[in-house]
Amino acid sequence: WGPISTTRGLRSRISRYLSPPLFPIRVRDLPNVTFHDVIPSTFHLGDLEVTADLITHPGSTLGYRITEGDETVAYLSDHEPAFGIGRIPDSPEWTSGSALAEGVDVLVHDAQYTDEEYARRVGWGHTSLTQLADFTRLVGARRLVTFHHDPAHSDADLDDFHEQLGSMLDGAALVAGVPQLEVDIGD
C-alpha cells in the first residue's frame, strides 16, 4: 500500500530499490506480494476502516489511520511533522499528520534523529526526538511505538534516545519497535 504516482506504479517504484546491488533479490522473485497504489482517501479492508493521507516528506508519502470498532492505530513512517522547527506548533491544523493520529490508541512513528542530528537534516522527511514527543502529546496518543531509527545508531544510542523520549511523553506509554513486535491495542 503506497502513494499513487503519475509516472510509475508502486510495484515499479519499489522494484527500483528492492533489487541488486541494494537488495539481494528482485521483487518479481518474492512470492505472493501484491502492490496497491493508493490515493488520499478512506476505504475498507474487511472490518478495518483505513484513512490514507499525504504527510510531509520530500517524496510522496502516505500516513495511515486504521480503525476497527473503537480501537485505532496510526502509522506514520518517513514523517517530518513540521519542517525546520525544533518544536511542533500547538495548533494541530499546522502540523502534518495530526488528523491521522488524533486520539489514537497506538501511534507507530518514525524515530530517526536526535535533536542535534535533525538540525543538520531539516527537510529530509524524518522527525527529531523533541518533535516526536511534541507530536505524540499534541495528538493525544495513548501509546507510542518507535521505529525507522537511524541505521547508524547503536543499541546504546537507541537506549539513550528512548530514555530521553520516555521522560518527555507526559503519560503516553513508550514501546521501542522491534521486528515482529505485537501490540495489543485493547490494553
Segment roles from a protein language model:
Residues 1-87, 97-98, 156-187:
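Binuclear metal-dependent hydrolase catalytic cores
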Residues 82-178:
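Cap/insert and terminal regions of metallo-dependent hydrolase folds
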